[in-house]
Amino acid sequence: MDKIKQLFANNYSWAQRMKEENSTYFKELADHQTPHYLWIGCSDSRVPAEKLTNLEPGELFVHRNVANQVIHTDFNCLSVVQYAVDVLKIEHIIICGHTNCGGIHAAMADKDLGLINNWLLHIRDIWFKHGHLLGKLSPEKRADMLTKINVAEQVYNLGRTSIVKSAWERGQKLSLHGWVYDVNDGFLVDQGVMATSRETLEISYRNAIARLSILDEENILKKDHLENT
């Protein structure tokens, strides 16, 4: 069986199994969706949002792009956010990065990759902005640190969109969260950047960057100690 036909075979088996487990499953799903969460994640095939959160279809609204970015000129992402906030009345938006992210590594390599370079420029801007946290780290730790910083920056970007600010101003319950998924062990890690208002956004963002600064200093001290022993 060729690869495309295999997908249809997989779909048939799945649909049959779901109907056997619950005869009204697809009818209920067709009637409405009631997700409580919007997931903004990376396009990487190793980070399947529904699977790693153990949620079913209809429970998680998902948008994915390279390196889980929220860019103020990206109308694709912003349209998803607006629909989630204004129509679905989602209460939680999660921005999730992940370890060993190809987008992060590509941005760090700074090679000519064609069209995608325009997208990666946003990651490179973050790198230059926080270069003091990245310069002395090993390449592997530098990528992990940039992944964490990127998550904090994207949560901050999201909180500054007119969509989210308007929701908060009218008293709508809406929380923003920044997480990192570790592809090495399958666990999600809360990065401690969380906001429920414009005020908490500023505080949470500053605190998250400050914590990463402390972590950076500890990593440098460990590296210096190992090199001198």
Curated annotation (Swiss-Prot):
The enzyme's first-digit EC class, named in words, is lyase
Superkingdom of the source?
Bacteria
> Under which EC number(s) is this enzyme classified?
4.2.1.1
Presence of keyword Transferase: no
Which cofactors, by name?
Zn(2+)
Binding site residues for Zn(2+): 42, 44, 98, 101
Record note on cofactor: Binds 1 zinc ion per subunit.
Q: Which GO terms describe its biological process?
A: carbon utilization
Q: Name one GO molecular function term.
A: carbonate dehydratase activity
| Listed Pfam families | Pro_CA
What keywords would UniProt list here? Lyase, Metal-binding, Zinc
Catalytic reaction list: hydrogencarbonate + H(+) = CO2 + H2O
Q: Which PANTHER family match?
A: CARBONIC ANHYDRASE (PTHR11002:SF76)
Q: Which family does it belong to?
A: Belongs to the beta-class carbonic anhydrase family.
Instruction: Please state what the protein is called.
Output: Carbonic anhydrase 2
